[in-house]
Amino acid sequence: MSKIIGIDLGTTNSCVAVLEGGEPKVIPNPEGSRTTPSVVAFKNGERLVAKRQAITNPNTIISIKRHMGTDYKVEIEGKKYTPQEISAIILQYLKSYAEDYLGEPVTRAVITVPAYFNDAQRQATKDAGRIAGLQVERIINEPTAAALAYGLDKEEDQTILVYDLGGGTFDVSILELGDGVFEVKATAGDNHLGGDDFDQVIIDYLVEQFKQEHGIDLSKDKMALQRLKDAAEKAKKELSGVTQTQISLPFISANETGPLHIETTLTRAKFEELSAHLVERTMGPVRQALQDAGLTPADIDKVILVGGSTRIPAVQEAIKRELGKEPHKGVNPDEVVAIGAAIQGGVIAGEVKDVVLLDVTPLSLGIETMGGVFTKLIERNTTIPTSKSQIFTTAADNQTTVDIHVLQGERPMAADNKTLGRFQLTDIPPAPRGVPQIEVTFDIDANGIVHVRAKDLGTNKEQSITIKSSSGLSEEEIQRMIKEAEENAEADRKRKEAAELRNEADHLVFTTEKTLKEVEGKVDEAEVKKAREAKDALKAALEKNDIDDIRKKKEALQEIVQQLSVKLYEQAAKQAQAQQQTGAGDAAKKDDNVVDAEFEEVKDDNK
């Protein structure tokens, strides 16, 4: 059975890990990095993952995770792509280098999502996995995964708060750990708050400064904006270690007097002033989670930081102020989520024993009832998997159909919450209002995905749906995307093989030239000429870039070079033999002058 890999599919960076010999291990990408940028670019029909070329290539997609579970589509080279398809391209890349590392096909994965992801976003993530050719064994919340990674080897019982500030999402979860049980007590968050927003405040500041100074709005210039984004991200990272940084962007724009540049110093104090409202926004969910769990800051034993943005000093200071304790720095915030996902994979595969994970649903679930009211059936922070039923009735006399409008959220009115789906229960026997009894049952599985069924208790007629949001994909669409992804994977494989073949052919040309110099005058000139012609033919094929021709010419040259090498060795062996014979003759001549003598051992008895 294939290994189950753990994937942290992040807004800005992704990471993949696997359990090896009971130990979780992060798999580095082909460039040797332990995290991979969640960036997809298209160039002349070719898909490039993790190449940060947004400056030069307008067909570059970043932070697609922010659009998961929506009907957003991005048009590239005349084709529209859903967020699921773009995410699948990233997942395919992670899968491919995990396969190279493990030396076997990978078909199963545990993928993490922000704890505050709703049903549509979770379903979209699962679909992305399927499109990438992965059986998604479990969707697991990022803070829960981090807690798994942190707490696996901890003996004592403790209550931990996981503060997860990623590139585009923010979550807080409070868990109780003890005897291998990881129980989530409460979770809260904001799906539109992350490191990208901290970059944005620096960008806005630089744009405003430049506008005041030169009267030019850089936010209208796509290439300038991308350069600003890169500079802002770099400045943000540098300010985690130093108190001021230099932002230098030459030739960012031009006016009638000539080129214009940005040359400015950004201090940590200024950055903290610009981002203070964002840091404060993260404190709301922290307080909410504590309240929902019925705890005070004093009840928290450890604060675990997850996500690259938690390196920002102001963030760490705010946590310290709010919770009265130093955050724990013993985990790598970029890798801990993927490691936790790999551990959960090990739990599912039976490799990790005595670990029980009890997660919760982040948002309340219910249906719309008379007057547009949102009636909750499952409250937020209920442990999953779970099932809950409630009996409803008709609102009008002789009503024969009931519309079931399924929602997720916390607001009292249905219109203010997120619609997950609608379905109808039909053929209800006509009766006065309030007489029919309709039982609505909600099931939430371990992935946090919702299934709903409605049953008329009078006729036992039942109607059920697995929620498909308006942005959800139909089975036909998923199958089509899987097929396209496989075709692209095949095209990528062929491209990779072609690149490897060209490299091998180049190397063979180089070594042949070297060999020909060595054999000159040592083997028959006709053989050398034959090899030289074959080498030139391969060079010509390389210039034409005809893969089949390169393969043929390479094989032909390899054979000739092998024959040359054999002849060279034969020649060398003959020479060595001739030298040995000459040496043996000389030794025999020397032996003629040797006189044999007898000797006698004399014993000295006086000693």
From Swiss-Prot:
Residue positions where Phosphothreonine is found in the record: T169
Alphabetical keyword list: ATP-binding, Chaperone, Nucleotide-binding, Phosphoprotein, Stress response
Domain of life, per lineage: Bacteria
Regions of compositional bias (Low complexity) in chain numbering: 571-586
Keyword Phosphoprotein: yes
Bias (Acidic residues) ranges: 594-607
Molecular function terms, GO-annotated: ATP binding; ATP-dependent protein folding chaperone; unfolded protein binding
Pfam entry (one): HSP70
Protein name as annotated: Chaperone protein DnaK
Native species: Parageobacillus thermoglucosidasius (Geobacillus thermoglucosidasius)
